[in-house]
């Protein structure tokens, strides 16, 4: 079957080569996850989940990096609640998916980008990848998705 690419998104590229769906983060140069990207990722995950011909979801970043995390501009008092709700929706859709999810990590994988990768079923990471949670140095709460999964649960549960 030929590769099918969805053109309805601007912050992610969604393509299908059944049984695999590819979701590529598209916000160069660092693939910072802004609210618009969160909304598109959630919409893409709902679309993917509805397709019986897709068994695997592969997340990757375009260019040189997976993702440098969530947009710092979304961490303000007037935006953080909405941002967290949208990001948690993405995490929930991914964790509750019946599809196998894989993060293909290269370059920077920081903050929310690392959270996104870590909630996938498998993480394939380049030896040169840089992982971290720099939001802690800004006084932001440590990664919610990672603490919510609490190490033991997800990988033993599947």
Residue ranges and their predicted role:
Residues 6, 95-158:
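Crotonase-fold acyl-CoA enzyme core
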Residues 23, 59, 71, 116-118:
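Hydrophobic/aromatic residues within transmembrane alpha-helices
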Residues 18, 61-63, 70, 127, ...:
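Short, small-residue-rich loop/turn micro-motifs
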Residues 31, 73-76, 132:
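Nucleotide phosphate-binding site architecture
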Residues 38-39, 53, 61-93, 109:
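Glycine- (often His-adjacent) and acidic-residue-rich active-site loop
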Residues 1-62:
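Conserved CoA-thioester-binding segment of acyl-CoA-metabolizing enzymes
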Residues 26-28, 78, 108, 136:
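Short strand-loop junctions, especially beta-strand C-caps/beta-turns
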């Amino acid at each position: 079957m030929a590769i099918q690419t969805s053109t309805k998104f601007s912050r992610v590229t969604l393509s299908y080569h059944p049984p695999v769906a590819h979701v590529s983060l598209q916000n160069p140069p660092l693939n910072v996850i802004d609210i618009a990207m969160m909304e598109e990722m959630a919409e893409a995950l709902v679309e993917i989940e509805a397709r019986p011909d897709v068994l695997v979801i592969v997340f990757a970043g375009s260019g040189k990096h997976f993702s440098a995390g969530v947009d710092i501009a979304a961490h303000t008092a007037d935006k953080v609640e909405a941002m967290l709700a949208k990001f948690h929706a993405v995490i929930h859709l991914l964790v509750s998916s019946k599809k196998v999810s894989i993060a293909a990590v290269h370059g920077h994988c920081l903050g929310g980008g690392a959270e996104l990768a870590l909630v996938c079923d498998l993480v394939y990471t380049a030896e040169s990848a840089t992982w971290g949670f720099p939001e802690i140095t800004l006084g932001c709460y440590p990664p919610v998705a990672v603490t919510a999964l609490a190490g033991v649960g997800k990988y033993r549960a599947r």
